[in-house]
């Protein structure tokens, strides 16, 4: 399966979010949408829920709504792809500092947990690998750094954390969208 839908550009999405006055960064919005999808909400109710969570229940303007639909479709496609094409939507480029990326990652994770929690209200009851991953995400959401730290070392650590978060999101998606039966399924004999 290939990704048919493309994500809007990060700066373009930032402009739409600022024009709408949502108070969210593109990374936070993507985290929220990703959390909702990973929690099992992949039907048409995602947009009104997003309005409730980010815009006091009011619909977004046309440009932002279109960009968010693209983001949702591309994210959903990437999460369902066997090639694991899902990536965190973080600022990138030469003009983006490692500190900006760390802040964006913390915002992404916080909003991912919000989206996941809205669709899976019993997150604290989740056990096993997924439960551990959710606990780790809660810790990552508190991510801090010292601006005196070696930026190269911080960049390497950040890349490892980003990859861990990506895999944790995929694990959540697999857990909540493909639930495992709690007891062995017993097939009843077919009467002819």
UniProtKB/Swiss-Prot annotation:
Q: Which SUPFAM superfamilies match?
A: YgfB-like (SSF101327)
Q: Name one Pfam family in it.
A: UPF0149
| GO CC, one annotated term | cytosol
What family classification does the UniProt entry report for this protein? Answer: Belongs to the UPF0149 family.
Q: What is this protein called?
A: UPF0149 protein YgfB
Gene name of the encoded protein: ygfB
């Amino acid at each position: 399966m290939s990704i048919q839908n493309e994500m809007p550009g990060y700066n373009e999405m930032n402009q739409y979010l600022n024009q709408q006055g949502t108070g969210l960064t593109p990374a936070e919005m993507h985290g929220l949408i990703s959390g909702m999808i990973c929690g099992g909400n992949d039907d048409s109710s995602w947009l009104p829920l997003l309005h409730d969570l980010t815009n006091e229940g009011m619909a977004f303007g046309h440009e932002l709504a279109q960009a968010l639909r693209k983001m949702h479709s591309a994210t959903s496609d990437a999460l369902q792809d066997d090639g694991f094409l899902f990536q965190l939507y973080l600022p990138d480029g030469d003009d983006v500092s490692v500190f900006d990326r760390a802040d964006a990652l913390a915002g992404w994770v916080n909003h991912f947990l919000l989206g996941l929690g809205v669709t899976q209200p019993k997150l604290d009851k989740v056990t096993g690998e997924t439960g551990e991953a959710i606990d780790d995400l809660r810790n990552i959401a508190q991510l801090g750094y010292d601006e005196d730290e070696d930026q190269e070392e911080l960049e390497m650590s950040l890349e490892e954390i980003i990859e861990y978060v990506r895999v944790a999101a995929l694990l959540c998606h697999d857990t909540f969208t493909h639930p495992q039966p709690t007891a062995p399924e017993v097939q009843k004999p077919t009467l002819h």
